[in-house]
Amino acid sequence: MTVTESAAAPSPVDRGEPLLRADELVAGYIPGVNILNGCNLDLYPGELVGIIGPNGAGKSTLLKAIFGLVHVRTGSVTLGGEDITNLKANDLVARGVGCVPQNNNVFPSLSVEENLQMGGFLKPGKFAERLDFIIDLFPNLKDRRGQRAGSLSGGERQMVAMGRALMMDPKVLLLDEPSAGLSPVRQDETFIRTRKINRAGVSIIIVEQNARRALQICDRGYVLDQGRNAYTATGRELMHDPKVIELYLGTLAADEIAPED
């Protein structure tokens, strides 16, 4: 199985205003200790943006700050021009922002369909419509709708977590290391799945330790280091930047993930 590089994304000038903007974010978990130190990010409509960098760079903290799970001390987050800084996760879901955390957070004693229902309160007709959409994205779940989530494989649990985040038809989806803990084959499937969701009209920010794979599918990438922006460019440009390769990627593998029609 191979992953092809995405074509260079249209420049931000061609895309109008950002759908989501994080501006000069300063945030942390302990009083007086900052993990983010003036971090910036723009996500344009229809874009797939990757965030990479070394451990402790602030990648996951940036997603948590956007999704209201870490308090932003200074700076702002806007969605469609509306200030959403430090709003609670439920309020962000209502505004069209979904999030899949690292640990997936599926409910093992509930069925797949019951887990998907936890994504939001929908009328029966709307739930059925969204369920059809999610099963189309994740056909492996079709015959497992009544199966308890605790009996699923890691890759299948991740599908459930993604499906639950998509249940409310978000404009923006935040993915925190979706390939973590998966086999190489399942990782490749995850990146194909992520691109498929993006092609269905969802703008995505993906944080990844598997930097090479993330850059192969993303339109643009941000390299974070010590809570700051170190590099920003298209995924292709970052993959071929000698300094980025030396500091963050190592020797690039020749294998690629083939696009899924």
Where are these regions (language model features)?
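Glycine-rich phosphate-binding loops of nucleotide-dependent enzymes
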Residues: T2-D261
